[in-house]
Amino acid sequence: MHVKTGDEVLVIAGKDKGRRGKIKRALPAVNRVVVEGLNIVKRHQKPRGPGRPGGIVEMEAPIHVSNVMLICPSCGRASRTGKRFLEETDHKGRPRKVRYCKACDAIIDK
């Protein structure tokens, strides 16, 4: 996936198109992400014991990863990302793979 937990993204399709948010949780098995404060749905929940009453609960639903675009931390624009290998190596001795912004060519990963 081109986004990770903690990235700031722009929603490019759907009912929240044009809104920004931070990724709360990534679900790579189903190619979806949960974005803070976006894609709010109402869930009718049954009571679950004495401490958890039932009712209509608002929660954030997952959005498909193709409907979000990463906002580059260096240039501040929503842009496509790519991956490249650096000269330095990771802990296993392999070249380190990082994401970069295709608009400004800055490395996104630390």
Swiss-Prot record:
Q: Does the keyword Transcription regulation apply?
A: no
- Keyword tags: Ribonucleoprotein, Ribosomal protein, RNA-binding, rRNA-binding
The answer to whether keyword Transferase applies is: no
- Quote one Gene Ontology molecular function term: structural constituent of ribosome
Q: Which residues form the signal peptide?
A: none
State a GO cellular component annotated for this protein: ribosome
Could you identify this protein by its name? Large ribosomal subunit protein uL24
Q: Which organism is it from?
A: Chloroflexus aggregans (strain MD-66 / DSM 9485)
The encoding gene is rplX
